[in-house]
Structure formats: C-alpha cells, structure tokens
C-alpha cells in the first residue's frame, strides 16, 4: 500500500510540474505576441516556442531532486525487502539478540493481545523501528562499500574490533650477528615501528605518560643505546603526534576494499589490535590515488643503491615527484619519516646485534574482518634508508709492518780527464759553421755558442770517443768542406748527446721558420707583446657541474630510448662552448640510426642544434656535442700565453682557439701549406682571419714574413695598412688583385731557379747558404743578373703569405685565370716559401673548384647553411650544425677527421693597438711591380720558362699589339694570319711578360707598356 501511495504522489508531482510548464509557455507566448504587435512585425516571423522559450532552472532542479528522492527510497525499500526475505529464508532459527532477552517488563504477544491491544502494537512498532534502523545502517555501509565511498570514523566500531590484551601473544625475536651498517638500519626501523605502536596505544587510551621503548628484549652486554626517552627525541615525538592528532581530528575515515562479505551484523571475527590501530596509516597510503585498498609501499624507494643505474633511477623518481606533486603517492612510511627527522640515528659507538630484516617481529597481518570491514593482507614494514652511524667505530685491518728498503750500491762516476776541464777558445769561423747546421742537426748550438760547450765536452768522456776529443781540441773541418756543392758539412758536435729529444726529420724539413740571422735577433726585440691585447676573461657561471652532466646523460639515454635506440653514456667532456657526451650504442644498434635522429634529439632536449660525431679517434664510441647554456669568451691573449704557442719555433704559427675541452689549438702554416676558410656571413670567418694575421705578427719580424692582403670588402684587412710586413698596399681592386697573384707566380719561378742553382730543396736551405756565405765575409752574386760583370748579391728571402678575405669576388672578376694562378701557387709554392690563406662566404662548387680543393688539404669550415656547403668544404657533413660566432671545424693536413675548435676573439681595438705599435718601427717597403703587373729586370729570363721555346712570330705580335693598342686574340690572328690557338698563346706570353694585363670581366685587356716605349 505504501508503494502505491508513493507512486501516485510521484505521478501527481510530475503532472503538476508539466502543468506549471504549460502555464509558463502560454504566458510567454502572450508576452511575445504583444511585443511583436507593438513593433509591427508579422506573426509568421515569430520564433518557435520550443527553441526560443527561456529555461527554468528552478523547475528542472525541483524535478531532478524529486526523481532522485523517489529512486533512492525505491532502491532502499527493495534492498530492505530482499535482506529481510533472505535473512528469514537462510536463518529461520536465528537466536534472539541479547538485548531483547533482558526485556522482562515487555508483555508477550498472547498477553498483549488478550489484555491490551494498544500496548502490543506499541511494542511491536518500537521493535520494528529498531530493526529498521539497524538494517538501514547496514545498508548504508553496504552502499558505501559498493560505491567505493568513505564513511565517517566511528570510535565505537574501532573499539569493538579491538580484542583484549590477553589475546595478543608476544613473539620472541631470534637474534643473530650482523654488520654494523645492518644493525644501524635494522635498529632504526625497529625502533620507529615500536614507537609508532606505543604512541598510538597511548593516544587512543588518552594516556599522558608514554612507556619507554626498548629495541630488543635481551640486548647485548655493554651495548650503549640512545633510548627513545632522550629529551631531544621526546620533543620531536611530541611535535609529531600533535600534528598527527590534528590530522586525525580533521579527517578520520577508513578505506574499504570493493569486496564485502554478507554476514549477520552480530557475527564478528577476531581482529588483531595492531591492525585496527594501524588502519589510519593504510588509509593515508591509499587516499592519494583515490582507491579503496591501501597499496603496499614501494620497496625500491627504500633500497640503498650504489651503482650508476640505480642512482639515475632515484634521480628520475625525485625529479618526477618534484615536478608533479599531485600525482605522486605518499606512503605512510614516507610520511612518518618526514615527521621524525631527528630519530634516524639511534645507535652508539658499539657493535649492535639485531634481528635481520627477514626475521622481523613486527609483521602485521589481518586475516578477516566481520561486519562489512576490509580484508587486509599486507605487511606494514617500515624500511628507512640510512647509512651507517657517522660516529661508529670501524675495525681497521692490522697495520702492515714497514720493511726498510735495501741500500743500493751506486758506483762512483769514472774520473774525467783534465783535458776536458781546461778552458778552451774555439777558433774563428766555428760560430758560423755551427749556426749553419741548426736546421738539420737541431743540437744545443746556443749553449755551445754561449760558453756551455764545456759541459757537453765533459760528457763525451763517458763514451770514450777520441776522435771527437781531437776535433774539440782544434781539428775542425775546413771551410770548403763545411760549405760547398760537392760535400756536406758535418757538425763537430754531431755525436754529442743532447738534453733535448731528437726531432723527426719531417719536422726539421717542415720547420722553415726556425732559422734566425743576427739581424733578426735585433729586430725580434720589437715584436708585439700580449700587453697590447685584452686580458683573458673567465665566467664561472658558464661552467657545468657534475650533477648537470649526469642529469643530461640520463636525459639523452631516455630520449633516445623513446625512439627505440638504446645507448649508454660512458663519458662527458665539458668545454667553453659545448659539451661532448660519448655514447656507446647497444648491441645491434647502428650508428646511422643515431645520426638520423639528430634534429629530433635536438628538439627533445631543447637545444638549437646537436652534432653527431660518428667516429672518435682512438675510441669505440660515438659522440654527441650539445651547446652549453652559457658560453665562455675566448680571448686571443689566452692562446698567445699558452705553452703551445709560446714554444712554437715556426714563424708561421697560427692561433686558432680552443678545442672542446678548453685546450689551446695552434697550427703551422708552413706544414699546411695553404689554408681554405669558408663560412656564412656572421659565422666568425673574418675574426678568425684577423686572429691568424695577428699570430704571425706576434711571431715574425718583417725580415722573416711579408704579406700581400686582398680585401674586396675594403673593411676587414684595410686596418693593417702601413705595417712594415706588407709587400704592397692592401689591395681592394680586383683588377690589381690578379696582378698581385701573377707577381706571386713569377716570384715562385724566380725562387725555384735560385734554389736549383744553390742546390737546396726549400727556402730554409737557401737562407742558410746565404748566412754561411755572409759569415765567411763572402757574397753570392745573382746568377740571373742583367749585368753579369757586376751582379747584385743575393739576400735572404722572406716567407710570403697571401691573404684573400673574399675569394668569391675575385673568382667572379676573372674566374678562369684566377683559378689557374691559384692552382699553380697551391701546387708549387710551398718549397718557395709562398703560402695562401683563402677565405670566402659562399662555399659553392663554382668558387671552391675541385682543382683548388685538391691542392689545399688544410681547411677550416665555420657555420654554413646546408649540408651541401659542408660537403663542398670538408667533403663531409657537420658544419651545418655549428653554433656560429667562431665555432669551426678544423681539418688538419693528412687526416680525414675534422677537429672542433672554438675560435679566439680578436676585437678591433686589439688590432688597432698592434698596428700602431708596429708602425713605430719603420715604414713598409713596398714592391712597385706587384700591382702594376710588371716584373723586375732579373726575371726577364725566367718569365718564359713555362712556355719552353719562344714563338718566332712573338716579336711581330708584340709590334702589332703596341701599334694598334688593342690586345685581342682575333686582332693578332687577322694581322699575322695564324690560327686561334697560336694567337692565344702569343697573348698569354705577352701577359706573362707584363706587356698586357689580365683579361677583365668583359674580356678586354689593357696595354701596360707606355706609348713612349712602343
């Protein structure tokens, strides 16, 4: 009957709601019609009622609450009916609860029916209401369990679950001997668990005095323990449990598992007191994830790790928990360890014997819980990761007895003859002969010349060489034997042992700048010093710590693992600009797979670019070069002050910068022997060229090195105008640049003829011959002089360095001819002492041709825009991933593996200081024929050497050109009635003679011979 009435009421409520809805619609329709009539609009333009009617949130909310209430009571009624029906069917003879047995004053059913019907009905009503309330409580708990909800904490339920103290049977621990570290860790863990249990008991019983906790029942004799009654620990525990009480008072609820046992409310099972007391800790462990069951703590978080992999895993967990605190699950053990920071070390300075962790006596297990409680089966074991106590005594091994070293019997040196101790004066000419052998023997000639020859003479006595002793007493080689074409000079101290290690023959041959004359020694005093440069600058904030390197290594492994490429970072090197991480691919992983992920890895790591080094010399791993967050400034003075630059003997030493580890990088242009520099605009190419020029100015005097500078941009190299090292003014016109290169070719031919006449193989040998003759007071005449009766004497020839700042512009002006001149210089100019430094910002195949690349093996690539440009310069990729601002790849001669170098910065202020300093010591000695295209008189017999025999019609062709003042191949061809090839050879011969200029960009040539001389 009740349900019928409830359903009728619900239907009436729905009908009332619909009626109110219809009334509202009619009212709204009436208002809209009135408004439209006022506006004069048509009725057909009215919107639809259902689409335009305003919403009534109050009606919807009322309807929702009414339906929800009806469904709830309907569900509760069905559940109660099913419960009562199943209870009566399954347990027909259920005993009467004890509470109803004590009702002596309640009349029976028969008495009440016969005597007083009203009393019986009231008793039955009270009993039914009590049963319904009890069933409602049961259904609420069941509904909460099914819906995975929380119910408020009821202390009476917890007290009912607690058994008496007599039911708890203590377990005696079994002790065994363990190490000090294990004892410290086990003692801490056991003490914390015991403390937790005792304080929970005291908290629930409202006790003020907390009993003391012992670590074990039977401790070892003489064991010194810091007990839990220590004042410091007591204050810590008081603060901890005050905070814990507030947490319990604010939110005290249980978490239930989704499983529910259907039992009678009066059927309870035995539960251990520890489980009921520790239930709040399990509740907090499962509360973070919003689940009903309490998760067991993560054992891996408490383990003590020592290897690299475990350390990296721990770092990852820490970083994830710091970044996402809302997603991390905080276990009960972690919460307790945070609340008790002072109680981590409770052991003294003695060995402790404690039960191991496998025999833990504090294992707590709940088997079953009645009346809808959870079924737990977990271990509440607290593990705290702590090292051994810092003040614990460690048993040291016995000291190793010291064994006295046996005495070594060293025989005394043999006596030295008096002949080697007497003062000796070398004869005349010995100093010059000794100087002539410096470049070949490389002995300590300076010590001999300065008076230190007595020590070396005394050392000869140990070898017993009488022949050398005789030569040291005055029997020297004659000057004819020391200098001549038929025999080679022998150094008198050739067999004397030297304190320095002997140099290789290749180094001696290539070190063309080691020779110095007497005049050079005087001029070298005026070389610039590093005081003209800015001091080195170091930024401590740009260095990376070991922790950052380790974190980056872990990130690299993780990011590559995301792309299914498993690698291992084995080492890292941090430099001023980049950091190289050496990775070892796993078995079966190809290096090309890492190379293909270059851009993806850079994007994943958040850096601008990454350079993958496929092969590292001397190692079996690959390299990943990542840019540093901040880069160091590398000053040029830092490279000049390094031992690598200061101890270099070559006059053509170039300071490049620092490598990836911060070590200075220098190279010798004489061994290069030519250098090709390429890079895009803004990559640091011009600054690198300035650093190279300053390196040679700091090393060589004008008598040793002369320069020809070609600067099409008229900005970079023009600041060197006026220094004494220049052979000609800085060339800014490309027409004159072709003449300068043509002069260099003629100078190369001249030097080759002179070296061939002198019988030497390089410029250093030629200068030695000149020095030897000057030491004897002789002069060697020029064999190719125009005045054979009175030839001019030969002088020392300096090195010539041709610097071209923009090679592409020079190629565009006179491409084919310039390419031929550059190729000839690159092929043959090394032995003649002429070296090239070519720089360009357009590294394309039409500028850097194959003929030029084949003759210039030493190359420097700054940042380029594409892989094609990198292949054009280095014949391999990599330059497109550079960082710019001086970051370069240096390809040394004789190797195919480029070296990454960070170029040194040379400011304009430093360059101006050095230039002004050099201008103080004299004006430059320019050679006029360099830019005019003419030649010196002594080269008239040399200039035609490349053409073999002279053409019989050459004089006629010259006459035709001078008369017509037109140097064209077609004009000579028509005038002399010859073929095109022969006429072209005649014009080229005139160009070599300096009669006509090189062809311009339009092909025209200029007559260089004045009209008066025609």
Swiss-Prot record:
Q: Name one Pfam family in it.
A: FtsK_alpha
Major localisation: membrane
Its recorded name reads DNA translocase FtsK 2
Query: At which positions is ATP bound?
Result: 682-687
**What PANTHER family does the annotation carry?**
DNA TRANSLOCASE FTSK, SPORULATION PROTEIN RELATED
Q: SUPFAM superfamilies this protein is in? A: P-loop containing nucleoside triphosphate hydrolases, Winged helix' DNA-binding domain
Q: Where is this region: Disordered?
A: 89-142, 283-318, 487-525
The domain section of the record reads:
Consists of an N-terminal domain, which is sufficient for the localization to the septal ring and is required for cell division, followed by a linker domain, and a C-terminal domain, which forms the translocation motor involved in chromosome segregation. The C-terminal domain can be further subdivided into alpha, beta and gamma subdomains. The alpha and beta subdomains multimerise to produce a hexameric ring, contain the nucleotide binding motif and form the DNA pump.
Q: Which GO terms describe its molecular function?
A: ATP binding; DNA binding
| Amino acid composition bias (Acidic residues), ranges on this chain | 121-140
* Cell compartment(s), UniProt: Cell inner membrane
Which terms are listed as keywords in the entry?
ATP-binding, Cell cycle, Cell division, Cell inner membrane, Cell membrane, Chromosome partition, DNA-binding, Membrane, Nucleotide-binding, Transmembrane, Transmembrane helix
Q: How does it sit in the membrane?
A: Single-pass membrane protein
Q: How does it assemble?
A: Homohexamer. Forms a ring that surrounds DNA.
Bilayer-crossing residues are: 1-21
Name the family.
Belongs to the FtsK/SpoIIIE/SftA family.
CDD domains, alphabetically?
A: TrwB_TraG_TraD_VirD4
**Which Gene Ontology CC terms are recorded?**
plasma membrane
InterPro entries in the cross-refs = FtsK/SpoIIIE/SftA, FtsK_alpha, FtsK_dom, Ftsk_gamma, P-loop_NTPase, WH-like_DNA-bd_sf, WH_DNA-bd_sf
């Amino acid at each position: 009957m009740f349900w019928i009435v409830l359903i009728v009421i619900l239907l009436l409520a729905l009908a009332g709601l619909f009626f109110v809805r219809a009334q509202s619609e009619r009212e709204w329709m009436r208002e809209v019609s009135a408004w439209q009539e006022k506006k004069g609009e048509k009725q057909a333009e009215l919107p639809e009622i259902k689409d335009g009617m305003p919403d009534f949130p109050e009606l919807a909310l009322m309807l929702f609450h009414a339906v929800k209430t009806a469904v709830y009571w309907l569900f509760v009624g069905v559940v109660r009916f099913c419960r009562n029906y199943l209870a009566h069917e399954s347990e027909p003879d259920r005993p009467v609860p004890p509470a109803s047995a004590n009702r002596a004053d309640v009349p029976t059913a028969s008495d009440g029916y016969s005597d007083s019907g009203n009393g019986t009905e009231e008793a039955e009503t009270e009993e039914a209401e009590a049963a319904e309330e009890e069933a409602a409580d049961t259904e609420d708990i069941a509904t909460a369990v099914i819906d995975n909800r929380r119910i408020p904490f009821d202390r009476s339920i917890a007290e009912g679950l607690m058994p008496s103290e007599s039911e708890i049977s203590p377990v005696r621990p079994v002790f065994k001997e363990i190490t000090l570290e294990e004892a410290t860790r086990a003692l801490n863990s056991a003490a914390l668990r015991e403390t937790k249990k005792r304080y929970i008991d005291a908290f629930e019983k409202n006790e003020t005095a907390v009993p003391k906790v012992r670590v074990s029942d039977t401790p070892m004799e003489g064991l010194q323990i810091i007990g839990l009654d220590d004042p410091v620990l007591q204050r810590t525990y008081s603060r901890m449990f005050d905070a814990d009480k507030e947490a319990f008072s604010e939110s005290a609820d249980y978490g239930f598992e989704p499983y529910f046992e259907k039992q009678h409310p009066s059927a309870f099972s035995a539960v251990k007191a520890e489980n009921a007391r520790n239930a709040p800790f399990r509740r907090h462990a499962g509360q973070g994830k919003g689940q009903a069951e309490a998760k067991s703590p993560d054992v891996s978080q408490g383990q003590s790790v020592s290897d690299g992999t475990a350390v990296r895993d721990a770092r990852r967990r820490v970083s994830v928990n710091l970044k996402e605190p809302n997603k991390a699950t905080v276990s009960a053990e972690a919460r307790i360890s945070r609340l008790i920071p002072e109680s981590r070390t409770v052991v003294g300075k003695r060995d402790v014997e404690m039960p191991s962790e496998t025999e833990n006596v504090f294992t707590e297990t709940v088997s079953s819980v009645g009346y809808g409680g959870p079924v737990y089966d977990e271990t509440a074991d607290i593990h705290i990761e702590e090292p051994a106590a810092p003040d614990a005594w460690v048993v040291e091994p016995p000291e190793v007895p010291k064994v006295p070293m046996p005495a070594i019997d060293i025989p005394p040196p043999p006596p030295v003859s008096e002949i080697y101790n007497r003062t000796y004066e070398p004869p005349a000419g010995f100093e010059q002969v000794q100087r002539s052998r410096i470049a070949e023997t490389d002995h300590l000639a300076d010590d001999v010349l300065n008076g230190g020859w007595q020590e070396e003479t005394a050392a000869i006595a140990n070898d017993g060489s009488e022949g050398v002793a005789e030569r040291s007493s005055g029997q020297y080689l004659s000057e004819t034997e020391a200098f001549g074409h038929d025999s080679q000079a022998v150094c008198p101290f050739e067999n004397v042992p030297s304190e320095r290690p002997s140099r290789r023959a290749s180094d001696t041959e290539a070190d063309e700048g080691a020779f110095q004359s007497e005049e050079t020694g005087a001029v070298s005093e005026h070389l610039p010093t590093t005081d003209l440069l800015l001091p080195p600058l170091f930024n401590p904030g740009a260095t990376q710590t070991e922790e950052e390197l380790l974190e980056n290594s872990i990130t690299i492994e993780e990011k590559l693992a995301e792309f299914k490429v498993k690698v291992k970072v084995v080492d890292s090197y941090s430099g001023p600009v980049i950091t190289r991480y050496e990775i070892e691919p796993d078995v079966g992983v190809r290096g090309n797979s890492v190379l293909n992920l270059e851009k993806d890895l850079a994007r994943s790591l958040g850096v601008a670019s990454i350079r993958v080094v496929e092969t590292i010399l001397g190692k079996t791993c690959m390299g990943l070069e990542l840019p540093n967050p901040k880069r160091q400034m590398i000053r040029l003075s830092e490279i000049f002050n390094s031992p690598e630059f200061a101890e270099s003997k070559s006059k053509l030493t170039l300071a490049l910068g620092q490598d990836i580890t911060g070590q200075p990088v220098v190279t010798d242009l004489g061994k290069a022997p030519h250098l090709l520099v390429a890079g895009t605009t803004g990559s640091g190419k011009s600054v690198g060229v300035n650093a190279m020029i300053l390196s040679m100015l700091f090393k060589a005097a004008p008598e040793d090195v002369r320069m020809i500078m070609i600067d099409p941009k008229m900005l970079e190299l023009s600041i060197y105008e006026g220094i004494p090292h220049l052979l000609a003014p800085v060339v800014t016109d490309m027409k004159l640049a072709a003449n300068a290169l043509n002069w260099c070719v003629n100078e190369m031919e001249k030097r080759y003829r002179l070296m061939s006449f002198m019988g030497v193989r390089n410029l250093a040998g030629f200068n030695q011959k000149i020095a030897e003759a000057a030491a004897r007071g002789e002069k060697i005449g020029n064999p190719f002089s125009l005045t054979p009766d009175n030839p001019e004497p030969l002088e020392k020839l300096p090195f010539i360095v041709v610097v071209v700042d923009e090679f592409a512009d020079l190629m565009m002006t006179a491409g084919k001819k310039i390419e031929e001149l550059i190729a000839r210089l690159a092929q043959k100019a090394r032995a003649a002492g002429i070296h090239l430094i070519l720089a360009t910002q357009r590294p394309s195949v039409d500028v850097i041709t194959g003929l030029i690349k084949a003759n210039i093996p030493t190359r420097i690539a700054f940042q380029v825009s594409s892989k094609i440009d990198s292949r054009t310069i280095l014949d391999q990729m990599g330059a497109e991933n550079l960082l710019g601002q001086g970051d370069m790849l240096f390809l040394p001669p004789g190797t195919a593996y480029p070296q990454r170098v960070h170029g040194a910065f040379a400011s304009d202020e430093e360059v101006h200081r050095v230039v002004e300093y050099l201008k103080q010591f004299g004006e430059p000695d320019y050679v006029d024929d360099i830019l005019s295209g003419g030649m010196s008189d002594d080269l008239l017999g040399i200039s035609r050497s490349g053409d073999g025999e002279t053409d019989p019609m050459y004089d006629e062709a010259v006459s035709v050109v001078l008369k017509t003042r037109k140097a064209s191949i077609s004009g000579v061809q028509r005038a002399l009635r010859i073929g095109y090839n022969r006429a072209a050879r005649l014009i080229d011969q005139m160009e070599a003679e300096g009669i006509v200029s090189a062809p311009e960009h339009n092909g025209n040539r200029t007559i260089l011979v004045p009209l008066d001389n025609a």
